[in-house]
């Protein structure tokens, strides 16, 4: 006689194991995306920057007026220092130009300066830092002493000094443009903005190059170039992304600071930068025209906050040790 009255009962451990088998493993990219989306500040900042990029990229369509177009013909009445209204959403400046339209064009120019100079400085700094950390010796000593020398002074002070020095050398200005050109400012920030990135990457390489997987790569005959490109840099991507976002912010704020002192780029009659608008805001503030201060400076602060949050989100995304739960 068989006993068929006792049902088969799954233990908790068996159920957990069965459930684990049914869960599809996430790829590294999916895990990084999940961690990034879990960072609320980065998510909101990404949306804001996405909208802002669409607006500035399509500036010819989104700007209500041309860069130097006046909101009203002077014969139709006063057009200088108009407060925000229907004809000028953010008011007008000292010669009647629409501040909203000029802000769109200015953010476009400043983002170009920031992104271009940041990419160049990160490329230079990553290359120097990786080579110095991996090879060591005299090259490492020389590069770190140069880095220490430049990092000993405030960045903006170095930029002002080197702007005057490089601008006086004809063959240099023949290559990278006049001191008032956007190309010169981008080159200036790139040439003297890589030191912090180099120190950061060097530290990462020094921490990684004695690890077992690097020793294994050397054992199978991998070259230094392959070790750097396939192992060291991929494992240093988090700090590099943080350095990139900070470099973008630094270049945008640096350009605005130079413009405030009258040393910024002069994009030309058909262009404007955010730094120029910040420079003009001081004149508006003296006359009590608050909109000339609030909107350009507010845009500068918004850019800095959003880019910083995006950098934080990227850092979390590549941090495999970060546990965000189910």
What positions do the PLM features span?
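Generic hydrophobic transmembrane alpha-helix motif, especially the helices
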Residues: 89, 93, 99, 120-125, ...
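Transmembrane helix boundary and interhelical loop/hinge segments in multi-pass membrane proteins
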Residues: 203-213, 313-321
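Transmembrane alpha-helices
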Residues: 108-124, 206, 225-258, 307
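Gly/Trp-centered helix-boundary motif
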Residues: 1-126, 130-131, 138, 152, ...
